[in-house]
């Protein structure tokens, strides 16, 4: 970080010559000097060059207005104002909070001023670095010799082997040197929450508006289990979102709890809706407790916020209404909601404490902020027994954490602190909205078909758009007003084939075909439904990537309309079965899969499959214990009616459990089986379109088997 920008428009010798001297002095201190053309060019430079560590400008020309604009982007960035002896320094005490240093134009003062700028730059870096990351950088620079773990010793061991050297060269020396042992006492301990690790947790809690925050190094799958193990002791009852992540199913397999499921909605597109407000009411919960064997009043509730498709709840309503001691918002996909006013009242840590309740929010820092994979956080608002909570934390945390993951978690928080973080999130929101509008524009200008966007008719206001009962764009029935909101950065594109009310069109392009084309062109889709594709506009998405996606979508339309051969348009798919796809063209492939979906009446089937839950014969914990005792057998998928499932069955998409361990598909819930059979049939007819179904195993003959409990194990 060594770039200094000079707005050099002084225009007279007595100003320009001191700046030339300063330029040379700064270069001797290894600074890189850049000259923006004007004020707007400077602001663009600050926006696009994060390594800029200072701005030099003429006070008479630019004054406080420029300083305030820069502060809105980065309030910590050092500013150096040059003035002559007669300049008026009309600066208030409030203005002095800006990071401004004043210098006078003078010949022969360049060395002293350059040294002052170097000192201020060092202070700037020290200010923006969070505590653990700062301590880790310091330790690596010191280059101590260690006789402890890890065995590669800062990368030395890798360089003693040809293949190890290739590995070392790829990742680089700092990655190796920062992979250190918990024996390094000056960095404290992740498990003991001591030293710089404790400071990092306190820092993160302040940034995320939490009472207490924990860094988790094995993803939000683990964070969810930590919260659940503490909040729901054996023998208790919990309320849990039926559209929960599979990690929460694993929690219920590990902990002997009785689940009562919240039942979310779903529209014709297969987009997961929210849990209706009625599900949170005391009377509804009391009825479910009465209907559920061995259930008691729930002690804990788990809600997925946002949903996989970007729908956020009015969390204030849930916190106030839900009559349980603790509420866990699984917010893996929205770690950014604390940093824009449009998310106020729509996230777990929003607002203050709730009397008599503990609010948890788990977030996948790595998913949509800037952190290494597996980086996750737990935020807590309310009173917990920290010693007991830490037992659950240690139960799921390695004693050899990777400090790179930990430091990246803290750095992600540091990036979101203050105005710089707000600017990052606002940039994502603006790019997503521009992309949405561009898709709409291209749709109106295209000949024939083009993609559409799942969103309100008018998106002129930057906000989370409400789903209202008097609107039809969302496709949900009986929606509660002021309850669910669409996050603008979660962009769902619609392909032809289905109307929002579930009516199937004669012409259709299943989204899986588009996803395969995009993958051929280096673009990975987050989630694919029957006729929809989800794209996430995270802070890492820039204009270039957004334009690349637009280009790929228009290229797909052009290739599709030309009706190219599959082997030319989708070569990876062609390689799955060259004989089958040899003479097939893209329109034939799309229309045949579309007809198969129409044949099964997908909208109605999907609705019925998720409307009636399978019967819970035993808890997921009890079913898993029987599996551990070997009391299971495999049967064909077609034969699972009337049998107790041993494992969860979870098709991708949408990636939520369809059948839980311990549940039985009955005649009433047969649509669940029919939905799974339809997914399998598409894969059987068209190689390369097999659906990934967790808990169902494809055999050599192409049929699927599932694991069920043996008949005698029902006793």
How would you describe each model-predicted region?
Residues 7-10, 199-201:
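Beta-sandwich/jelly-roll carbohydrate-recognition scaffolds of carbohydrate-active enzymes
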Residues 33-34, 213, 259, 525:
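Generic structural signal for residues in well-ordered beta-strands
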Residues 174-222:
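Conserved N-terminal alpha-helix of the aminotransferase class I/II PLP-enzyme fold
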């Amino acid at each position: 970080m060594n770039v200094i920008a000079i707005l050099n428009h002084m225009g007279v010798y007595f100003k320009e010559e001191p700046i030339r001297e300063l330029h040379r002095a700064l270069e001797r201190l290894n600074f890189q000097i850049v000259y923006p053309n004007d004020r707007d060019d400077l602001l663009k430079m600050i926006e696009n060059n994060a390594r800029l560590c200072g701005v030099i400008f003429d006070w008479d020309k630019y004054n406080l207005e420029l300083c305030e604009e820069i502060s809105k982007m980065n309030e910590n960035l050092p500013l150096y104002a040059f003035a002559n002896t007669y300049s008026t320094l009309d600066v208030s005490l409030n203005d002095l909070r800006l990071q401004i240093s004043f210098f006078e134009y003078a010949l022969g003062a360049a060395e002293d001023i350059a040294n002052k700028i170097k000192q201020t730059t060092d202070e700037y870096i020290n200010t923006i670095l969070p505590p653990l990351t700062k301590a880790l950088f310091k330790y690596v620079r010191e280059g101590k010799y260690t006789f402890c773990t890890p065995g590669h010793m800062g990368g030395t061991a890798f360089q003693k082997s040809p293949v190890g050297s290739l590995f070392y060269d790829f990742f680089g020396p700092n990655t190796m040197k920062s992979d250190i042992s918990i024996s390094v006492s000056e960095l404290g301990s992740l498990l003991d929450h001591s030293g710089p690790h404790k400071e990092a947790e306190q820092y993160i809690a302040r940034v995320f508006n939490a009472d207490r925050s924990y860094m988790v190094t094995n993803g939000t799958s683990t964070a969810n289990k930590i919260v659940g193990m503490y909040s729901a002791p054996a023998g208790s009852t919990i309320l849990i979102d039926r559209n929960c992540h599979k990690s929460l199913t694993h929690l219920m397999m590990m902990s002997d709890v009785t689940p009562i499921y919240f039942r979310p909605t779903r529209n014709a597109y297969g987009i997961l809706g929210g849990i209706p407000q009625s599900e949170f009411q005391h009377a509804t919960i009391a009825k479910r407790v009465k209907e559920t064997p061995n259930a008691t009043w729930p002690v804990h509730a788990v809600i997925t916020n946002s949903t996989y498709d970007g729908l956020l709840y009015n969390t204030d309503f849930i916190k106030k209404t839900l009559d349980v001691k603790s509420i866990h918002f699984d917010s893996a996909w929205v770690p950014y909601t604390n940093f824009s006013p449009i998310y106020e009242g729509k996230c777990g840590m929003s607002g203050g404490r709730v009397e008599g309740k503990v609010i948890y929010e788990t977030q996948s820092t790595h998913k949509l902020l800037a952190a290494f994979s597996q980086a996750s956080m737990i935020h807590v608002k309310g009173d917990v027994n920290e010693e007991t909570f830490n037992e659950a934390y240690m139960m799921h945390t390695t004693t050899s954490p990777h400090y790179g993951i930990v430091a990246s978690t803290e750095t992600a928080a540091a990036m979101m602190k203050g105005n710089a973080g707000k600017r990052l999130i606002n940039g994502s929101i603006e790019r997503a909205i521009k992309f949405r509008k561009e898709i709409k524009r291209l749709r109106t200008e295209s000949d024939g078909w083009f993609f559409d966007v799942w969103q309100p008719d008018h998106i002129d206001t930057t906000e989370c758009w409400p789903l209202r009962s008097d609107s039809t764009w969302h496709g949900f029935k009986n929606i509660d007003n002021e309850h669910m909101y669409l996050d603008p950065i979660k962009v769902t594109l619609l392909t032809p084939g289905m109307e929002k009310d579930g009516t199937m069109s004669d012409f259709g392009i299943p989204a899986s075909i588009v996803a395969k084309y995009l993958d051929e062109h280096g673009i990975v889709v987050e989630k694919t439904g029957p006729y929809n594709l989800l794209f996430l506009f995270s802070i890492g998405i820039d204009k270039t990537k957004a334009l690349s996606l637009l280009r790929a979508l228009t290229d797909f339309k052009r290739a599709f309309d030309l009706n190219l051969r599959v082997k030319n348009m989708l070569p990876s798919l062609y390689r799955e079965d060259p004989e089958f796809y040899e003479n097939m063209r893209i329109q034939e492939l799309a229309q045949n899969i579309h007809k198969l979906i129409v044949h099964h009446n997908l909208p109605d089937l999907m609705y019925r499959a998720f409307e009636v839950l399978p019967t819970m014969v035993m808890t997921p914990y009890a079913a898993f214990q029987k599996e551990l005792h070997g009391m299971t057998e495999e049967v064909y998928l077609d034969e699972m009616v009337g049998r107790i499932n041993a494992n969860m069955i979870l098709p991708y998409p949408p990636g939520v459990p369809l059948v839980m361990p311990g549940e039985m598909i009955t005649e009433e819930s047969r649509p669940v089986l029919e939905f799974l059979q339809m997914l399998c049939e598409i894969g059987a007819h068209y190689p390369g379109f097999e659906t990934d179904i967790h808990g169902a195993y494809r055999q050599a003959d192409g049929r699927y088997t599932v694991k069920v409990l043996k008949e005698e194990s029902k006793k």
